[in-house]
Amino acid sequence: MKPSLLHRLEGVSERFQELAGLLSEPEVISDNARFRRLSMEYSQLEPVVEAFRRYEGAQADLTAAREMQKDPDPDLRAMAEDEAATAAERLETLELELQKLLIPKDPHDHSNLFLEIRAGTGGDEAAIFAGDLFRMYSRYAENQGWQVEILSQSEGEHGGYKEVIARLIGAGAYSRLKFESGAHRVQRVPATESQGRIHTSAATVAVMPEPDEVEAPEINPADLRVDTYRASGAGGQHVNKTDSAIRLTHLPTGIVVECQDERSQHKNRARAMSLLAAKLFEAEQARQQAEQSATRKSLVGSGDRSERIRTYNFPQGRITDHRINLTLYKLDAVMAGDLDPVIEPLINEHQAEKLAALADE
């Protein structure tokens, strides 16, 4: 094992012991936010420390077996050779496991997320496609046992959405969908096309983690302009009677969010504030990443909304992810919510990139 990797593992073990002590201190136990944060860090380090202990055990076995190989007794030497080979094999397996465990974790992988889909070029067909994408993600969420809450929607004239914003609530939601941000392109014959010509349309998808209480940016009420208006869309007669929909404008950044799904203005405001916090958090994260200007450009982790990431070709039943040259001929299943065959290769590629970066250190 490389000395740099060994040094890092020793540091993780020391931090793990430190956390064990901190979590038993009364002042930490009484501080819920700090206790929760330290407990999460402890649980993240535990599998690394356990694997490192197994590695150290295998290393000790290998050292002992090599000492035994010096014994004059040929039977003992033969047995020692077998033990040394077994220990060396275990070491190799455990080193790879430890490298994977040391890959920096995305602290937001456990988070809920905000999903924003906007129709791009293509007019009515783009709005219909945006609706298809929202249905695809909603079905995937249902299959995962997540909740889907629509915060805001602007319907297309012939179906679908000009824009739809939703909150997806579920363990690990962000970890599964974080690579969906970008431009999605569709190639198909629109229902309104009488000549049977294939049209190309697009929609943009943005996936933002919902920041927790500790990391959510503080929003100064003086920095907000609050507008109320009457909700549009489904909801019966009630929608025309009260100004329950909320639009928040964050004056320093110009970011605008809306929420109109709840009948209560108070609930709409709370949801809009949560969405605004996520957008401000995302903007700050993007700024920090730009400042760091990483030398290794990630293939799948950039999250640039303008980047064309995927093409859905309906005549051929083909879906292509351009970031990793993935092509699947199971478009119907994917559009019906079977997204894992697309998501898993992206996650694996991202992990391989991080593993390569770790090996280069």
UniProtKB/Swiss-Prot annotation:
Keywords: Cytoplasm, Methylation, Protein biosynthesis
SMART domains: PCRF (SM00937)
The record's account of how the chain is modified after translation: Methylated by PrmC. Methylation increases the termination efficiency of RF1.
Sites bearing N5-methylglutamine, chain numbering: 237
Single Gene Ontology MF annotation: translation release factor activity, codon specific
Signal peptide: none
Gene Ontology CC, one term: cytoplasm
Location relative to the cell: Cytoplasm
Family: Belongs to the prokaryotic/mitochondrial release factor family.
Its job: Peptide chain release factor 1 directs the termination of translation in response to the peptide chain termination codons UAG and UAA.
PANTHER family per UniProt: LD18447P
HAMAP family: Rel_fac_1
Protein name: Peptide chain release factor 1
Gene that encodes the chain: prfA
